Regions:
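Repeat-blade elements of multi-bladed beta-propeller folds
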Residues: 23-27, 62-93, 123-150, 174-198
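Hydrophobic small-molecule pocket/channel-lining residues, especially in calycin-type beta-barrels
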Residues: 85, 98-104, 125
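Hydrophobic/aromatic beta-strand positions that recur at structurally equivalent sites within the blades
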Residues: 41-44, 97, 153-154, 204
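Boundary at the C-terminal end of the N-terminal hydrophobic targeting segment
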Residues: 2-6
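Short gly/pro/ser/thr-enriched loop/turn and capping motifs at secondary-structure boundaries
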Residues: 116-119, 151, 169-171, 195
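Short loop/turn segments that connect beta-strands within beta-propeller blades
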Residues: 99-103, 154-157, 206-208
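Aromatic (tryptophan-biased) beta-strands that constitute blades/sheets of beta-rich domains
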Residues: 7-57, 103-123, 159-168, 210-216
């Protein structure tokens, strides 16, 4: 991890956002436009689209996260995606695929947190047990779990770089949104108003997961 540590995360992400062949963040850019400037698909040929390949998540129920496509992850173009959380035994599985051959992607690694999981998060989740994806910068894929963990993984290996516990299902708090990265910080909120959870937003340093601030 840390392949871009000499560069502010904003510079790194803006450079990626300027490349139409990448989908480097939730919503693609800081404005969350969700707009691609690719022009290969047109109104003239859209009716000829066919499925090229598929990758299963082994998780039923809601899927709302956008896969990220990131160039130069250890010299490879990689796709990162996160599943929903139908149960704690199969909750928020991250998969990383090598897109060097875009017609025949290969899974490089997968990750699921195995310890300290909280099954009570499943019935407390509002609007289904979905996950809305993750963010990438400084060689790390950062995402959150339904039961309240914010996790940074090494983009090349899938190994944990840091893990913090942020939301607590016993207090009605669950996480479905993707964390956002800006100015070398990771930002995350949570849901829980249906259970009268007291809201807050927190920021952690991207490098090591140390807490930068919390706002209630």
């Amino acid at each position: 991890a840390g392949q871009a540590s000499a560069m502010n995360s904003d510079e790194e992400q803006l450079k990626r956002m300027a490349d139409p062949d990448q989908w480097p963040a939730p919503g693609r850019d800081f404005q969350l436009t969700r707009h691609s400037t690719l022009s290969d698909i047109t109104t003239d040929n859209v009716n000829k689209l066919q499925m090229s390949w598929a990758q299963g998540t082994n998780a039923l129920r809601g899927h709302e996260g956008q896969p990220l496509v990131i160039k130069d992850v250890g010299g490879k173009t990689m796709l990162f995606m996160v599943s929903g959380c139908p149960s704690m035994s199969n909750c928020n599985v991250v998969q990383a695929l090598d897109l060097s051959d875009p017609d025949n992607p290969k899974q490089v690694w997968s990750y699921v947190k195995k310890t300290d999981r909280d099954e009570s998060a499943v019935p407390r989740a509002c609007c289904d047990t979905v996950n809305r994806g993750g963010s990438y910068a400084d060689g790390k894929f950062v995402y959150s779990t339904l039961d309240g963990f914010v996790i940074a993984l090494d983009g090349q290996t899938g190994k944990e770089v840091w893990v913090v516990k942020y939301a607590y299902p016993e207090k009605g708090e669950t996480i479905t949104p993707a964390p956002l990265i800006a100015n070398n910080l990771v930002f995350q909120g949570f849901g829980g108003d249906e259970f009268a959870a007291r809201g807050r937003v927190a920021a952690w340093n991207l490098a090591d997961g140390s807490e930068a601030w919390v706002c209630h």
